[in-house]
Amino acid sequence: MEGFLLPLVIHPRVRKTIGRVAAMTCVAVFASAGAAYAACPAQTTTTPFAQWGDHSSYFLVPGGSFEGTESQVGWNLDNAELTAGNEPFYVHGRSDDQSLTIDGGGTAASPVFCADATMPDFRFFAREDSPGGDLKVEGVIQTPYGPYTATVATIADGSMPSWAPTAQLKIPSIPTGWRIPVSLRFVVSGGGSWQVDDVYVDPYRAG
């Protein structure tokens, strides 16, 4: 059960802040996007965290297994790269053999995907490859006026020396009935480096 007990620094203002912004701007920002007021399309789901007691269904973030070339994976990488070696639990597939390494000062942003109020949680696998920096996780909401970024959690330097699943992290709040384009961004502060693999979103968990 150690995957649920990682020493994360969670930012509780995220849901309240994004909720206020969304409430004030959703109509103005998204009303012109005809399909904004609707649920996201159904996704193929699995139960990748069942062995840690989490039997919820999750879908893989686009490119979130980090298998293939950088162009096939589609993530925006800066001082980060696809590297050999998968997380050791092989929750996405036994043939997987790659993960993402982010060096100090580097960033990695997922492709934009559709998110709605039924998708508040996400999880992934991580380990600190070399010490010296925190791993910050951000939710980036895309709007016609530019991206809105909120820090979701910070995984502290030294807290994950070996591969493990993270706790359930919160995607910034989305008003019921709306869908928005969002991406997840990982930032390594300071020195050191982190590995990330198999990034999943839970489309069903309530609250």
Locate predicted features.
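N-terminal secretory signal peptides that target proteins for export/translocation
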Residues: 1-17
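Short beta-strands within extracellular/lumenal beta-sheet-rich domains
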Residues: 94-121, 132-134, 166-168
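Exposed low-complexity, polar/acidic, P/S/T/G-rich flexible segments that act as propeptides
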Residues: 190-207
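Extracellular glycan-recognition surfaces and repeat-rich motifs
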Residues: 50-53, 59-98
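Solvent-exposed strand-to-loop "edge" motifs in beta-rich extracellular domains
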Residues: 67-71, 112-117, 123-132, 140-142, ...
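Extracellular carbohydrate recognition and processing domains
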Residues: 52, 144-180, 187-195
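Sec-dependent N-terminal signal peptides
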Residues: 16-27
